[in-house]
Amino acid sequence: MNKRILVTGSSRGIGKAIALALAQAGFDVVVHARSRIDEANHVADEIRALGRRSDVLMFDVTDRERTKQQLEAFIEQHGAFYGVVLNAGLTRDAAFPALLDDDWDQVISTSLDGFYNVLKPIIMPMIQLRKGGRIVTLSSVSGVMGNRGQVNYSAAKAGLIGATKALSLELAKRKITVNCVAPGLIETEMVTEEVKSHALAMIPMQRLGQANEVAGLVRFLCSDEASYITRQVISVNGGMH
């Protein structure tokens, strides 16, 4: 049986790197995007070029009903997922007094409602399949340490760590591992030169991370070799803490 993994937020950046790394490791991958359907389709084409199957789903993880409909319909047609990588996230940075209500709500909802909305329709079919499984969430160094100008993002990502650890306890006896990867500053199109120059002073390795370095860890956590690793938060941050 081919093992299929859903990667949310995988049309670009770290999510795309994760999707391609999993395909290279022999997994079939379902690519997800909120709106960038053309980019998601391109990633799916790259996965198929590697000899793996790939489908594309498009929904906003904060929309509970839409997410449920899309995932339940997919599972009914294709069967349960072997794994899920929760990568979809959102930043809206500002000093706390300047945060807008929507800045708080959207960042929290994308990470925490997204966790619930995506996993709720997926977990029971995974359990019923009795084949074990892998769940990996993407937190952040901000969720581990806190970061000025990111009270909303730090809260969201710290909450994700707590949810990950709690869920791992419920699923361990089902041979479904649940782990969290916490990247530091990773070189993506979202990182400005100003942010980069400020951040380098805080990174002992004196460089930004690369998306493939995060993807390599996620790939390992989804592998058979990681079957005894669960409830862990593993940082990829160049020694920031």
Where on the chain are the PLM-derived regions?
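Residue(s) in the substrate-gating loop at a strand-loop-helix junction
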Residues: S140
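Conserved glycine-rich cofactor-binding loop
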Residues: S11-G13
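Active-site helix of classical SDR
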Residues: L119, A156, T164
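Substrate-binding pocket helix/loop in short-chain dehydrogenase/reductase
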Residues: A95-F96, L100-I108, A199
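C-terminal substrate-recognition "lid" of short-chain dehydrogenase/reductases
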Residues: Q210-G239
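Alpha-helical segment proximal to the catalytic Tyr-Lys
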Residues: M124, L169-K173, S227
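Conserved glycine-rich Rossmann-like NAD(P)H-binding loop of the short-chain dehydrogenase/reductase
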Residues: F27-H42
